């Protein structure tokens, strides 16, 4: 059992040394070579905990501000593995992603130093940011190729796979491939149903947007309830899929928010209605 465990207040760190005080009120500063240290455990700062509570409560704007403050406060030790400056910076980027602020994400990533991240899922998330950046730049063919490679890997969490499918859906939509886009957006639901509330909501609205604007759907809406209605047509199938999504929005996907007005009319095309 180790006997040389020390509880200290770390002030700064470099690639070779750590500067610390024995207590927060101590005047004397000491220095120790990192080569002599086996491992470091950080206590969670109160400010980080408060920001995380906002994050879990889906107040991403408030959480982003909180994480930014933690990142700045502890940046003198961001060389150390597992430090809270690096971790706060990661969640600051995540807040920008959940707010769909892709330009803000790009700016934060440009200055981010991820080397001290220790959690494998966080490291994997960094790889997915390349897909989000392709969305930002509307690099659709590259994004299709990128997500092909990503989806072939097994390392992703459900939330991460949902992101990959969502970005892929946007790429297919950008390439005017509506059915492929719908399949990809449906993958978002399958990968992480309602847990990634921002993505599932956005994917649902994307599906409704695509279906409503599809020429086959427009024809099915025109023929609905007439003798020329064709329940076996692609348009009729898409129309009923949209109706089901509208119902699902009210039950779970909407998170308590009303269905946008432009999609309310779809509900009148419910079969047997």
Question: Predicted segment positions?
Answer:
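Flexible, glycine-rich surface segments
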Residues: 132, 141-200, 206
């Amino acid at each position: 059992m180790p006997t040389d465990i020390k509880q200290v207040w770390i002030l700064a760190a470099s690639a070779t040394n750590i500067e610390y005080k024995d207590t927060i009120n101590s005047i004397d500063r000491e220095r120790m070579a990192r080569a002599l240290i086996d491992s470091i455990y950080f206590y969670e700062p109160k400010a980080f905990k408060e920001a995380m509570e906002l994050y879990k409560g889906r107040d991403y704007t408030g959480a982003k501000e909180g994480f930014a403050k933690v990142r700045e406060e502890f940046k003198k030790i961001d060389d150390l593995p597992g430090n809270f400056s690096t971790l706060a910076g990661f969640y600051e980027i995540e807040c920008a992603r959940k707010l769909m602020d892709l330009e803000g994400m790009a700016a934060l990533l440009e200055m981010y130093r991820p080397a001290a991240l220790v959690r494998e899922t966080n490291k994997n998330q960094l790889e997915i940011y390349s897909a989000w950046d392709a969305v930002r730049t509307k690099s659709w063919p590259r994004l299709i190729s990128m997500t092909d490679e990503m989806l072939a890997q097994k390392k992703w969490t459900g939330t991460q796979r949902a992101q990959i499918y969502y970005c892929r859906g946007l790429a297919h939509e950008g390439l005017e491939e509506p059915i492929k886009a719908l399949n990809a957006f449906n993958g978002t639901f399958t990968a992480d149903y309602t847990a990634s509330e921002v993505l599932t909501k956005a994917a649902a609205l994307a599906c409704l947007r695509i279906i409503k604007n599809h020429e086959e759907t427009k024809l099915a809406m025109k023929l609905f309830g007439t003798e020329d209605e064709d329940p076996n047509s692609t348009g009729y199938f898409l129309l009923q899929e949209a109706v089901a999504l509208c119902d699902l929005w009210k039950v779970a996907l909407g998170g308590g928010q009303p269905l946008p007005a432009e999609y309310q009319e779809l509900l009148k095309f419910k079969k047997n209605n």
